[in-house]
């Protein structure tokens, strides 16, 4: 709830607590978890808390930098599904930064491919994955989907 205080979103303790409770439930956590210490949470739960901390401020745009890279495959899937659900519910736009093309394919509509800090390709997910134009994009796709 610190973000609520800093950004003065709610002066009322009752509204403050209601907003916290709503976002905790939205990200798939239990209300009794609010009294736990940080070391008592799993990696997936910590990621859900990070998402809740961002969303409680009611942004239109959320920048996610490698949000699933430290998570195992099962938890990655859960977090991606959660992000898609929250995107729809809260009408969010994401800038999703990742090296994992399988995750990018699952969550993105538009994709920007960068090499050495320079944009080499920007197109729809369909075009990037089905007919990439830049050789670097082609190389990335080939190496990512060899399995």
Regions found by a protein language model. Give the residues of each.
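Conserved ABC ATPase "signature" region
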Residues: 2-5, 14-32, 141-142
């Amino acid at each position: 709830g610190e973000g609520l205080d800093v950004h003065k979103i709610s002066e009322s303790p009752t509204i403050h607590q209601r907003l916290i409770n709503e976002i905790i439930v939205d990200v798939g956590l239990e209300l009794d978890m609010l009294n736990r210490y940080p070391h008592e949470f799993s990696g997936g739960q910590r990621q859900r808390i990070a998402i809740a901390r961002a969303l409680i401020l009611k942004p239109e745009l959320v920048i996610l930098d490698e949000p699933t890279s430290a998570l195992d495959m099962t938890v990655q899937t859960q977090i991606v599904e959660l992000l898609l659900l929250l995107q729809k519910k809260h009408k969010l736009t994401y800038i999703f930064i990742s090296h994992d093309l399988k995750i990018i394919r699952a969550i993105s509509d538009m994709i920007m491919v960068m090499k050495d800090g320079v944009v080499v390709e920007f197109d729809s997910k369909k075009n990037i994955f089905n007919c990439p134009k830049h050789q670097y994009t082609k190389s990335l796709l080939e190496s990512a989907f060899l399995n």
